[in-house]
């Protein structure tokens, strides 16, 4: 099922019928997924236990997901355009990962959107999984607030290290991070100490304490050690499109991460 759910997230390439009345307003915002519904032509199967957050920020989007039953995680990132006349959103994915697999070749998908009173609904009428056809419906609820910060947007990590006493280790990973409406998320694809590849994510709320410090509260994560906890993070902006962050980890190590803003 974990592979099925990931396929649902990144394979939204099939259109559904939309009437002339379906218009797409600005999609910028933060959304929690409430439910996925799969229909095999005979019955609906509903999934309400997945924890997923999605952000549309300016011209870019990002989503992160974790299954609390087994901590299997997924994320994706890319650019998007809202097509008012057709009632669709076109997403151009530049990177996605799930569990032990990743995809870094560009892919474009057209999503048909129905705006609801508190968010939106996405319907994919036909998607192939395990050689069978399904209809997929996803329901999202808007969250977040009107808070604006210099961090708002989607960022790619360019370099990061962990410092332990006199030892410095360079992280071998791909990591993205996003901020919007008082929420943050990160997604990473890493090799662990046994050289096994895995996907990790986290998302929650954040607030600016000062120009050089934020507080992040992780609501859901692949990593139990950070889920439900708050962390003070030192930040240093280098113009509007670069920043670095420094955090003292619970094990006494220090993590330093450098980011660049995604731009078209």
What are these regions (language model features)?
Residues 81, 203-208:
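Beta-propeller blade signature
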């Amino acid at each position: 099922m974990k592979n099925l759910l990931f396929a649902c997230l990144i394979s939204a390439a099939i259109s559904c019928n939309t009437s002339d009345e379906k218009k797409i307003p600005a999609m910028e915002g933060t959304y929690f997924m409430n439910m996925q519904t799969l229909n095999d032509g005979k019955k609906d199967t509903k999934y309400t236990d997945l924890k997923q957050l999605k952000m549309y920020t300016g011209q870019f989007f990002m989503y992160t997901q974790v299954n609390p039953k087994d901590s299997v995680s997924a994320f994706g990132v890319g650019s998007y355009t809202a097509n008012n006349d057709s009632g669709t959103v076109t997403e151009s994915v530049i990177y996605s990962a799930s569990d032990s697999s990743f995809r870094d070749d560009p892919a474009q998908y057209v999503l048909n959107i129905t705006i609801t009173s508190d968010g939106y609904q996405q319907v994919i009428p036909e998607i192939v999984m395990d050689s069978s056809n399904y209809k997929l419906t996803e329901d999202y609820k808007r969250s977040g607030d009107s808070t604006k910060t210099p961090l708002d947007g989607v960022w790619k990590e360019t370099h990061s290290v962990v410092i332990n006493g006199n030892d410095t280790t360079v992280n071998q990973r791909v990591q993205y991070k996003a901020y919007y409406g008082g929420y943050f998320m990160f997604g990473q694809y890493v090799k662990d100490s046994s050289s096994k590849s895995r996907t990790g994510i986290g998302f929650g709320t954040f607030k600016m304490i000062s120009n050089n410090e934020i507080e992040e509260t992780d609501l859901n994560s692949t990593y139990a050690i950070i889920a439900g906890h708050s962390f003070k993070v030192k930040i240093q902006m280098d113009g509007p499109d670069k920043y670095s962050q420094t955090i003292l980890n619970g094990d006494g190590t220090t993590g330093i991460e450098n980011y660049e803003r995604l731009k078209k």
